[in-house]
Amino acid sequence: MQLTAYLHTAITVRDLQRAQAFYEGVLGLQLVHRALNFPGVWYEIGGVQIHLIEQPHVHPERPDPHRWGRNPHLAFAVKDLAQAEQELRAAGYPVQKSTSGRAALFTQDPDGHILELSQV
C-alpha cells in the first residue's frame, strides 16, 4: 500500500448551525459547496477537508481532560497566536496554552472537540 495524500477528517456535531458559526465565523474556514443528502458541511484548508456531520449524540474522546493537547484534536497553523487567542476569548471559547513551551494553544468547538492553533 502506498498512501498518496491526506484527504479529510470527519467529525460529528450536535447542532450544525452552531458549529458553522464557530468554524466559519470564528475560525474563518471557507465552505466547500456540495450537495449532500444528509445534514453536514465541508470545509477546505491547505488542500485538506474537514467534514462536519450532524448527529444527535456527540461524545468527543477525552482521555486526559486536564491537558487538552494529549487528546484527539485537529491542528491548524495561525499567523498570529496572540490575536487568535484574543479572538477566541472574545467569542467566549475556552483557551488552554500548550504546556510544551511552544507557541501553541488549544480550544474547543461548541461540541467539545479540541483544536490546536500553532504559530509556525
Describe these PLM feature segments.
Residues 1-18, 71-76:
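N-terminal beta-strand motif that seeds the catalytic metal site of vicinal oxygen chelate
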Residues 2, 85-120:
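Vicinal oxygen chelate
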Residues 12-50:
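Core segments of cupin and vicinal oxygen chelate
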Residues 36-39, 70, 100-103:
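Short acidic/glycine-enriched loop/turn segments that link adjacent beta-strands
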Residues 57-63:
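A short, acidic/glycine-rich surface segment
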